[in-house]
UniProtKB/Swiss-Prot annotation:
Cellular component annotations (GO), alphabetically ordered: extracellular region
Native organism taxonomy: Eukaryota, Metazoa, Chordata, Craniata, Vertebrata
Domain CUB residues, every copy: 30-131
Family: Belongs to the spermadhesin family.
InterPro entries in the record: CUB_dom (IPR000859), Sperma_CUB_dom_sf (IPR035914), Spermadhesin (IPR000124), Spermadhesin-Link_domain (IPR052129)
Organism: Bos taurus
Domain of life: Eukaryota
Name of the protein in question: Spermadhesin-1
Expression sites by tissue: Seminal vesicle tissue, ampulla and weakly in tissue of epididymis.
Length: 134
């Protein structure tokens, strides 16, 4: 990756962290198709236990996903980052960590949140935005 493409990404993340990402569209539903150029997938506290968001960008863009901080109960819940539509290769299945960054190989990425039915949802925020094809 070129340094010139890293700098805007770092600036966006630092701004998003300071401003708590309040300026981005927030999705707190359990799944859906997201077509905004950027936004936040935020904790869904409802009764559903398997939430799938498919992020679609125009063909000339990749999807970039960033998770600043994640502390899920690893035995009971996880986030899965998929490179494309559901059923495509999994880029990561995660439950904890910080400063995680994923980039799709094409213009679609899927984020899946799964938890056990008796376990309450933990806090999570997933920032997504379009990234020009290089």
């Amino acid at each position: 990756m070129k340094l010139s493409s890293v700098i805007p990404w770092a600036l966006l993340l630092s701004t998003a962290t300071v401003d708590s990402m309040d300026w981005l569209p927030r999705n707190t539903n359990c799944g859906g198709i997201l077509k905004e150029e950027s936004g936040v997938i935020a904790t869904y506290y409802g009764p559903k236990t398997n939430c799938v968001w498919t992020i679609q960008m125009p063909p000339e863009y990749h999807v970039r996903v960033s998770i600043q901080y994640l502390q899920l109960n690893c035995n009971k819940e996880s986030l899965e980052i998929i490179d494309g539509l559901p059923g495509s290769p999994v880029l990561g299945k995660i439950c904890e960590g910080s400063l995680m960054d994923y980039r799709s190989s094409g213009s679609i990425m899927t984020v899946k949140y799964i938890r056990e039915p008796e376990h309450p949802a933990s806090f999570y925020e997933v920032l997504y935005f379009q990234d020009p094809q290089a």
